[in-house]
């Protein structure tokens, strides 16, 4: 069974052609392999560039008539008088408020937005950083305004066509990978992106129009007399409209005036966040990771432009504070011993770019509004950030609310009756409650999983913590992985694609610029293949006692240029000679070589041996004359810990000063 989109325009307009729109057949059994065959990806210096998408869209032959401008004929053939435009008041100019204002404006409504401070995102300004907009929200934006959605997607960094998922915080090993690409392309949805909150807000504000947004206008109260709604600003000004939408955040004044005061729920976690000028070695293959630990976890995401956004969550009571200039130091202590992917980002972030906030949410409620007033976004269902769906749900809310108001106006025009605003608001609320409630619960479950995650037996057991040295996998980790592997595809399919059929008039399409690597499916199934695909420089950084006088060793990826390590130079042997003038190092100690993107060390029957400590803390002596595979974050010792080196994979080679800072930071951690 196929559901096919037909593109039937014989004479497409120049505006359509300028967008490079192409016809595409969408099948329920649409194969990602077919999608992979489309050439679309642009790379420069190994980093993904943003390419304006090629997409499919049906051409509409005539401009739509908004419901408020619609006329009809009475029984005697006389035209009815066009209806007066609805006056919509919006409290809050954050993402949800602006998206709804845009949706309402596109449908011909008279909109007025009140925002306390449009110069910065509420609470954290420019340092709050990027936001992830997933496929479901991008599709809703397309249904609201295709051109604005295009601007947003072009300004964003695509992460959904790379590997994303959960890893163990200490070892860095993959725990579970998320496929957000297949659910999107199979349903003709845009692929997930990350975009700066400030950039997103600026695009939306420009599209809404400065004449619609009243800056420095804080709504503190409202009056609903059944016929109209009047908002009261902090400065005493009053404005009247047909309805009021509260989009004023987790501490919503509109919500408080509707249902009385209530406290937000503390998640149990405080969150540090920052943006680092850093490019991970696997930036081309990995979009974002969630590093799991016991009662702490760490999230990192590529945000484009050579920057990484990170969030560090730590379980502790609310209201804590750090010593002056003490955030970075505390984080290095909390996450000391974690994998390099975490430590690298903390080291690369300036102290004054790190912010701290406690994480709150609000439990789902059955009442979203009353009379001519309703709520959307964080004002009614603030979520924990673990699924990246908080802003996405606000965007979906905005589309649905504007749609219900449009339907009410259409019914009014058809039957010549007053617009039933109250019923349309309740219809919007009913349409959204179940989906929002489920996703809200999933976000909480993700936090619970992070709270209870234990990699090994003994973690969090106090006197029994010595058991961790035996590296026995915790049964909960093993069972949890089975559950996640089975349930995650279904969950992602529903979260990303479950709202697509409600987007009336949106044509399913795929952008060629969102093409994934041909090896994406293999990377999901094979961790080794994913590591081999890493296009980076491999280095050995001095890391042991007494090794501070040693220099970093840059390894060659050329299979014909091995490195020979010894206490004397070996210029007569093909390849690169590395001299370590230490008594524990034999004259010809070991050889390091590269094969198919992987690195191996071979001990050449040295007197004191070659030792490897892997990323899970297991130390072993390599067999003589037998190549032993090593990985980033492993430690290699040539004879003793005085000639110990930590394996690093870097996107760009480090300068000498940076190598010293990296070594000092790792040793301190």
Swiss-Prot record:
Q: Which pathway is recorded for this entry?
A: Plant hormone biosynthesis; abscisate biosynthesis
- This protein's transit peptide sits at 1-49
**First-tier enzyme category under EC:** oxidoreductase
Q: Which Enzyme Commission number(s) are on file for it? A: 1.14.15.21
Q: Which InterPro entries match?
A: FAD-bd, FAD/NAD-bd_sf, FHA_dom, SMAD_FHA_dom_sf, Zeaxanthin_epoxidase
**A single GO cellular-component term on record:** membrane
Which positions carry the signal peptide feature in this UniProt record? none
* Gene3D superfamilies per UniProt: 2.60.200.20, FAD/NAD(P)-binding domain
Q: According to its UniProt entry, what is the function of this protein?
A: Converts zeaxanthin into antheraxanthin and subsequently violaxanthin. Involved in the epoxidation of zeaxanthin. Plays an important role in resistance to stresses, seed development and dormancy.
| Entry protein name | Zeaxanthin epoxidase, chloroplastic
Q: What organism, scientifically named, is this protein from? A: Solanum lycopersicum
């Amino acid at each position: 069974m196929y559901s096919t989109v037909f593109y039937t325009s014989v004479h497409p307009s120049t505006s359509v052609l300028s967008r490079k729109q192409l016809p595409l057949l969408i099948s329920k059994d649409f194969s990602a392999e077919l999608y992979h065959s489309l050439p679309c990806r642009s790379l420069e210096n190994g980093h993904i560039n943003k390419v304006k998408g090629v997409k499919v869209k049906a051409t509409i032959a005539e401009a739509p008539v908004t419901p408020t401008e619609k006329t009809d004929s009475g029984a005697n053939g006389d035209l009815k008088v066009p209806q007066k435009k609805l006056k919509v008041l919006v409290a809050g100019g954050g993402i949800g408020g602006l998206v709804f204002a845009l949706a309402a404006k596109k449908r011909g409504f008279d909109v007025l937005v009140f925002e306390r401070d449009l110069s910065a995102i509420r609470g954290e300004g420019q340092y709050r950083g990027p936001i992830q907009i997933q496929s479901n929200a991008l599709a809703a934006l397309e249904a609201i305004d295709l051109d604005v959605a295009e601007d947003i997607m072009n300004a964003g960094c695509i992460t959904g066509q790379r590997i994303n998922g959960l890893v163990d915080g200490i070892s860095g090993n993959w725990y579970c990978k998320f496929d957000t690409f297949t659910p999107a392309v199979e349903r003709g949805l845009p692929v997930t992106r990350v975009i700066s909150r400030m950039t997103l807000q600026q695009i939306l504000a420009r599209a809404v129009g400065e004449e619609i947004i009243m800056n420095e206008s804080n709504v503190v109260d409202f009056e609903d007399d059944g016929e109209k709604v009047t908002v009261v600003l902090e400065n005493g000004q009053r404005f009247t409209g047909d309805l009021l939408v509260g989009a004023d955040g987790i501490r919503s004044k509109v919500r408080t005036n509707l249902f009385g005061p209530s406290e937000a729920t503390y998640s149990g976690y405080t969150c540090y966040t920052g943006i680092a000028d850093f490019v991970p070695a696997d930036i081309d293959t990995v979009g974002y990771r969630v590093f799991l630990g016991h009662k702490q976890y760490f999230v990192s995401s590529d945000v484009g432009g050579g920057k990484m956004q990170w969030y560090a969550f730590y379980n502790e009571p609310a209201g804590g504070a750090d010593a002056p200039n003490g955030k970075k130091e505390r984080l290095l202590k909390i996450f000391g011993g974690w994998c390099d992917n975490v430590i690298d980002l903390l080291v690369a972030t300036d102290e004054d770019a790190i912010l701290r906030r406690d994480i709150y949410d609000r439990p789902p409620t059955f009442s979203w509004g009353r009379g001519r007033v309703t709520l959307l976004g964080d004002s009614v269902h603030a979520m924990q950030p673990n699924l990246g769906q908080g802003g996405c749900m606000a965007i979906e809310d905005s589309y649905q609310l504007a749609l219900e108001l449009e339907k009410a106006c259409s019914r009014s025009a058809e039957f010549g009756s007053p617009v039933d605003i109250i019923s349309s608001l309740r219809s919007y609320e009913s349409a959204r409650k179940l989906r929002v409630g489920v996703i809200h619960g999933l976000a909480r479950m993700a936090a619970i999983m992070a709270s209870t995650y234990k990699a090994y037996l003994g973690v969090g057991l106090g006197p029994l913590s010595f058991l961790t040295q035996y590296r026995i996998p915790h049964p909960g980790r093993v069972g949890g992985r089975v559950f996640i592997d089975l349930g995650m595809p279904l969950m992602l399919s529903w979260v990303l694609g479950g709202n697509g059929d409600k987007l009336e008039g949106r044509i399913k399409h795929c952008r060629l610029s969102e093409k994934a690597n041909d090896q994406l499916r293999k990377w999901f199934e094979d961790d080794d293949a994913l590591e081999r695909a890493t296009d980076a420089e491999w280095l050995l950084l001095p890391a042991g006692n007494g090794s501070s006088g040693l220099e970093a060793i840059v390894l060659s990826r050329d299979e014909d240029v091995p490195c020979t390590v010894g206490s004397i130079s070996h210029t007569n042997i093909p390849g690169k000679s590395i001299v370590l003038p230490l008594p524990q190092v034999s004259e010809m100690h070991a050889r390091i070589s590269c094969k198919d993107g992987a690195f191996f060390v071979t001990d050449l029957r040295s007197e004191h041996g070659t030792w490897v400590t892997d990323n899970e803390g297991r130390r072993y002596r390599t067999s003589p004359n037998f190549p032993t595979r090593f990985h980033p974050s492993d430690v290699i010792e040539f004879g003793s810990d005085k000639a110990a080196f930590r394996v690093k994979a870097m996107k760009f080679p480090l300068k000498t000063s940076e190598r010293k800072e990296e070594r000092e930071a790792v040793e301190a951690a």
